[in-house]
């Protein structure tokens, strides 16, 4: 229905902005949409992530390149699909997020929020690998249609890798959560992670990754008590 389409559009926006973790309208019937829960948030564990990276690096498929960029940048699908070759700065090892690809309209549009426009620092070896990729003239990542691969296409490719590696199944958007979860698990400051993700507010990051932060808090509490005990 028209109303469901409007609701779905808002939900997709909320997922992109990480206000919620899952598009609960995707397979929902009109009369019974389920609410999203934080427990639906899925991300790869470190061993699963390492296996995925190894598999992706061995492929020259455009969808594989997009997966690799998602892993190391934490960018959204629309942001990665919206990249052009000029957005890759190989001298400074950065990618410039300044627009997004809108598949329905088949055109570039502004990013979701002002803070979504950002320059993301990338690992040197990943940018060296990207130098060998063949970028399209209009889009960095072009499929045989001359347009960026669809969200469905990159999700299918990702699923093939995960199934082959016997890893948990996540979506392409789940790579964004994996990126953030990995950095937070390595004690990277949440303010920096929030900026890297392009969140409008650090509170969004705090709310999305509360499960990880609660776990880290218990560890930090014990460390603090151990230090205080030495006084």
What residues fall within each predicted segment?
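Basic, Lys/Arg- and aromatic-enriched nucleic-acid-binding interface segment
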Residues: 1, 5, 16, 20-77, ...
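N-terminal core-binding DNA-recognition domain of tyrosine site-specific recombinases/integrases
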Residues: 1-19, 23, 38, 147-153, ...
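Proline-centered turn/helix-capping motifs that create local helix->coil transitions or kinks
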Residues: 15-25, 90-93, 130-133, 137
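Conserved tyrosine-mediated DNA breakage-rejoining catalytic core shared by Y-recombinases
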Residues: 29-30, 82-132
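Short, basic (Lys/Arg/His-rich) helix/loop patches that form interaction surfaces
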Residues: 54-64, 73, 120, 135-139, ...
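Short, polar N-cap/turn motifs at the start of nucleic acid-interacting alpha helices
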Residues: 87-94, 188-210
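Catalytic-site neighborhood detector that most strongly recognizes the C-terminal catalytic loop/helix
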Residues: 101, 127, 197-223
